Amino acid sequence: MTTTSSKVAIKPLEDRIVVQPLDAEQTTASGLVIPDTAKEKPQEGVVLAVGPGRFEDGNRLPLDVSVGDVVLYSKYGGTEVKYNGEEYLVLSARDVLAIVEK
């Protein structure tokens, strides 16, 4: 699995990961522009940093995601964080629903 690694200067602890949400669709299939107020929260993002995993019964459990993975996550999971002008989401590994295969 993974060790602690990062593409940003944020080091998540335990079983947390830092994700950069992918932008929501700007237009509909018919070409209508979607205003920011009507956009759904994104549920897909790129993993930028991975914590070392949590301890259970004295053993550290590695995470199933790696830096660079594109993941689907719970719509209202995690904490939104702004750092150096960028927006990130800090999620527990439990909030990750799936890894998107390329």
Swiss-Prot record:
InterPro entries associated with the record: Chaperonin_GroES, Chaperonin_GroES_sf, Chaprnonin_Cpn10_CS, GroES-like_sf
Compartment(s) where it occurs, according to its Swiss-Prot or TrEMBL record: Cytoplasm
CDD domains, per the entry: cpn10
Keywords: Chaperone, Cytoplasm
GO molecular function: ATP binding; metal ion binding; protein folding chaperone; protein-folding chaperone binding; unfolded protein binding
One GO term of the biological process aspect: chaperone cofactor-dependent protein refolding
Subunit structure: Heptamer of 7 subunits arranged in a ring. Interacts with the chaperonin GroEL.
Function (record text): Together with the chaperonin GroEL, plays an essential role in assisting protein folding. The GroEL-GroES system forms a nano-cage that allows encapsulation of the non-native substrate proteins and provides a physical environment optimized to promote and accelerate protein folding. GroES binds to the apical surface of the GroEL ring, thereby capping the opening of the GroEL channel.
Similarity comment text for this entry: Belongs to the GroES chaperonin family.
Protein known as: Co-chaperonin GroES
Organism: Streptomyces coelicolor (strain ATCC BAA-471 / A3(2) / M145)
Lineage per the UniProt record: Bacteria, Bacillati, Actinomycetota, Actinomycetes, Kitasatosporales
Gene name tied to this protein: groES
